[in-house]
Amino acid sequence: MAEENNEQVIEDDPIEVRRAKREALLAEGKNPYGHAAFEYSHHIVDLDEKYAELADGENTEDAVSIAGRVMAKRVQGKIIFFELQDATGRIQLFCRINALGEDAFAEMKDLDLGDWIGAHGLMMRTRRGQLSVAVDSFQLLSKALRPLPEKFHGLNDKEIRYRQRYVDLIVNDEVRDTFQKRSKILSAFRRYMEADGYYEVETPILQTVQGGATAKPFITHFNALNQENYLRIATELHLKRLLVGGFERVFEIGRIFRNEGMDPTHNPEFTSMEAYCAFNDLQGMKKLAQGVIKAANAAVNDSEQLEYQGQTIDISGEWPSIPMTEIVSKALGEEVTLDTPVSHLVELAKKNGIEVKPEWTAGKLIAELYDEIGEPTIVNPTFVVDYPVEVSPLAKR
């Protein structure tokens, strides 16, 4: 009776079922994680392009080898349909017992979603128009012990998505696309900066003093020197030292660490790109910012008109420069300047839900109004200029 209960527990637990399959493979002398490199002939996206004109119901004698993760399985008697996913896309595997033989067919029937396999076969398109590989042999490359997120509900919990990105990447194609675009964007940044005469450098992440921004740092102890060190909160100070040393143009793409709040738009660890150029001014840096962003967009998009969150963003042409007071005035429906009485700015701030501190000056109040009601009105790329001195600690005066 106890043995029957144990078997029932295993059947009810998908992880235990998979572990039992792995143990069965090991008992048969088979390696559930492959024992040699698998040489694939194509990525799936290449097959989609090469056989785009293949007619419905047409078979070929073109042999291919592909590798990927099993994302779906459908058994219909002596035929099994798999959906295989690699880093570039998905394709159907058409598996017939006559082509595979009974033993291999039984092994394929025992595969689980999430298993990694390599498959060899001939290209074809089903009568229903599905591009497929008619499999004649396969190899288990890695047995998955954990089931994928449920097919129809997917992975929607933001907390899990952020903490387990590898799972998010498996089931959400748009996330994988974002990762790939990010890589292309960083490469475009580097190409543009290097073409413009900038040297890419690496500055220390562990620093003996905190500086370069007003943020709380992560603190660690350096045992060898018996001293407190800080994870950098900005790359600024060391980049400026390189200019002091004689470099004219430098930039760094690097990780920044700030021990502060965390939400979907703020991460304690993030990447920044910071650049410095000798003999330059605001106009020159505006030109740099516009150029590098347009270059990054060109690397991942075919147009300079982008659809984002229901709005069309136009990054073409020269980007406008608008004073902060002008943006705030437009949002308020009345003109405000740095000469506007503080008492009136306080009234406007409170009216817009801003908690005002007694020490705030006109410049600080305008900056707060900009953050609250001005910035949300900006859609296209815009250089906001003439920041108040109170919120511009590093600006020339």
Residue ranges and their predicted role:
Residues 1-397:
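Class II aminoacyl-tRNA synthetase catalytic cores and aaRS-like
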